[in-house]
Regions:
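Two-component histidine kinase catalytic core, primarily the HATPase_c
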Residues: 43
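Phosphopantetheine carrier-protein modules
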Residues: 18-38, 55-66
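Thiotemplate assembly-line natural product biosynthesis machinery
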Residues: 1-23
């Protein structure tokens, strides 16, 4: 799966947790999930679990702690898929 495909899927997953959908229209790899998209930290756990389900990857707590941006999530998923 390409980086672009993974990014699109991650944004699709985020759509269910972001109250203001217009924020996702401008989202890039540098978009901070908690600050820019205004997702609370409890929801970030739900997002990570959903990513595990969708991508068939296991993300441990240390790895999850390093996810701050959309790009961080995409990079981690790419590493897990390799």
């Amino acid at each position: 799966m390409s980086e672009e495909q993974i990014t699109k899927k991650v944004i699709e997953i985020l759509r269910a947790y972001v109250k203001d959908a217009s924020l996702l229209e401008k989202a890039t790899a540098e978009t901070h999930i908690l600050k820019d998209l205004k997702v609370n930290s409890a929801r970030l756990v739900d997002i990570i679990i959903k990513c595990e389900d969708v991508f068939g990857a296991t993300i441990d707590d240390d790895e999850a702690d390093r996810i701050a941006t959309i790009g961080d999530a995409v990079t981690l998923i790419q590493q897990k898929a390799a």
